Design a protein with these regions (language model features):
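C-terminal hydrophobic structural anchor segments
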Residues: 178-196
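General beta-strand structural signal in soluble alpha/beta enzymes
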Residues: 8-11, 17, 40-42, 67-70, ...
Length: 212
């Protein structure tokens, strides 16, 4: 398709780390595209939601380190995983998507382990962040599969280059595209996958300032 002039958006991992192709999150680096980009790579789902939240902060304050832990829906594995969860809940034997039960469990493995000890999912978070946001950011990632249908969650700890105030960051995020700030903790209002299901926004809770 690309050879005959069509523009192709590829959702697989085939082109993501290809040096000749751009890895695009529209809210983050969509302006990098030109009319000559006929194959556009789409990042991993966990990378997309993280960078939508972090890009505005990086632009203004400079991120030097990211520590991210993901709690990923079984839908990322596919229908077979949803069937496994439902079967286990109803005490029915069936095909297993994972090597272990997922009902009432958390599995610290998303995709295969690589020689460096990280899983492929964790390396996607690291490598894609470097390609899209900044190759100089130190990134540590942990990915966990949890018995949830419909939404990935992430806990992210940042080290910033410039000094900041929490209220300024909250204002920045609330004014950014693709982000819904939900941080009314006194009234128990915060992001949860059950309420994010079917929505496009990244639901965000900014909790604490460890600068001091």
């Amino acid at each position: 398709f690309a050879e005959v002039g069509s523009t192709v958006i590829d959702n697989s991992s085939a082109w993501r780390m290809d040096k000749t192709k751009k890895l695009i999150v529209p809210e983050v680096n969509g302006n990098d595209l030109t009319i000559d980009d006929k194959i556009i790579a789409n990042p991993n789902c966990s990378t997309i939601q993280m960078l939508i939240a972090l890009a505005p902060i990086h632009i203004k304050y400079g991120i030097t380190r990211i520590i991210v832990s993901t709690y990923q829906s079984i839908t990322g594995t596919g229908r077979i995983a949803v069937n496994q969860l439902n079967n286990e809940y109803n005490n029915i034997e069936g095909e297993m998507a994972y090597k272990y039960p997922i009902h009432q469990n958390a599995i610290p493995q998303c995709d295969e382990f690589e020689d460096n000890g990280y899983t492929k999912e964790e390396m996607k978070l690291i490598n894609e962040t470097h390609k899209i946001l900044d190759p100089n950011i130190s990134v540590t990632a942990t990915a966990v599969r949890v018995p949830v249908i419909g939404g990935h969650s992430e806990s992210i700890n940042l080290t910033l280059e410039k000094s900041f105030q929490i209220d300024d960051i909250k204002k920045l995020l609330s004014e950014s595209n693709g982000i819904k700030l939900e941080d009314d903790t006194r009234n128990f209002k915060y992001p949860m996958p059950i309420y994010a299901k079917g929505k496009d926004d990244v639901c965000l809770l900014y909790t604490s300032d460890a600068a001091d």
